[in-house]
Amino acid sequence: MNIENTLLKQDVWRFIDNTTINPAFDAIQSFATDDTLCRSVGARMAPSTVRGWVHEKTVSLGIQDSKLPDIDKGIAFLQKQGYRVVVRNSGGLAVVLDSGVLNLSMVLPDAERGIAIERGYETMFTLIKDMFVDCNEVIEAKEIEDSYCPGSYDLSIQGKKFAGISQRRMAKGVAVQIYLAIDGDQTTRSELIRDFYTISGKAKQTKYTFPDVNPNVMGSLSDLMKNDISLNGTLVRLFNSLRHYAGDLVSGTLTSEELDLFPAYYERLIARNDKVLT
């Protein structure tokens, strides 16, 4: 058994389903939920948890994006295109969320600080390869520099990125988060972020590095696998993989203790977004 499989093998995996689009449950609430899970799972109040989540027409910005010289113009542009804009609390740069993008958060306890950063990335990479074991092409983990939100654990097929992984570490918990472009027009998503950076004045500054987004280096899983991959079908793949690794796989929601923790994390994110976006 290799080292990343030891993290996937859990006595219990809990799955929380937030994949049904609900206008009353926005991306800020999603990020606050992951903070709550870091706290509860890290304190062993709850089992290791995988949460699936989907949000319609949202652009999730990284903290670095907020430093763009003309960020106000960029945000106005995104809003004019019908997108909600939020600033998240995990690493990376701007990404697009919509009904064709499935986000997964894998939350694990790290009480002994035994989960090195690379180990967290490799664990999610292993899970995705297991879920799509029928892919005829090699799924690679490497940076696609001219994609949006480039990182060392971009997942790609034949050089085209379909997913990106980030991590959030707090309160003795680790949340490894991935967005998966399941279907939809990845070219349009890429052009949206490219234009956002142009309008936000990327060229006016040199302190930070922002990507020159090239839509030709990104694609959806449906296109890259030449198969009609659906969100529900991807969830079935996830369940099958987790069943392989779990002693027990349970479906649930936040516990009463977690619901008590949630408001403080939500209010913190609201304050951060108000500071950056207003």
Curated annotation (Swiss-Prot):
Pfam families: LplA-B_cat (PF21948). Residues 44-250 form the BPL/LPL catalytic domain. SUPFAM superfamilies: Class II aaRS and biotin synthetases (SSF55681). GO terms for biological process: lipoate biosynthetic process; protein modification process. InterPro entries: aa-tRNA-synth_II/BPL/LPL (IPR045864), BPL_LPL_catalytic (IPR004143), LipL (IPR024897), Octanoyltrans_LipM/LipL (IPR050664). Pathway: Protein modification; protein lipoylation via exogenous pathway. GO terms for molecular function: lipoyl(octanoyl) transferase activity; lipoyltransferase activity. It comes from the Bacteria. It catalyses: N(6)-[(R)-lipoyl]-L-lysyl-[glycine-cleavage complex H protein] + L-lysyl-[lipoyl-carrier protein] = L-lysyl-[glycine-cleavage complex H protein] + N(6)-[(R)-lipoyl]-L-lysyl-[lipoyl-carrier protein]. Its EC number is 2.3.1.200. PROSITE patterns: BPL_LPL_CATALYTIC (PS51733). The record marks 161 as: Lowers pKa of active site Cys. Catalyzes the amidotransfer (transamidation) of the lipoyl moiety from lipoyl-GcvH to the lipoyl domain of the E2 subunit of lipoate-dependent enzymes. Takes part in a pathway for scavenging of lipoic acid derived from eukaryotic host cells. Cannot use lipoyl-tripeptide (DK(L)A), lipoamide (LD), or free lipoate as substrate. L.monocytogenes is a natural lipoic acid auxotroph and relies upon exogenous sources of lipoic acid for growth. Thus, this enzyme has not the same activity as its ortholog in B.subtilis which is involved in the lipoate biosynthesis pathway. The reaction proceeds via a thioester-linked acyl-enzyme intermediate. This is Lipoyl-[GcvH]:protein N-lipoyltransferase. The gene is lipL.
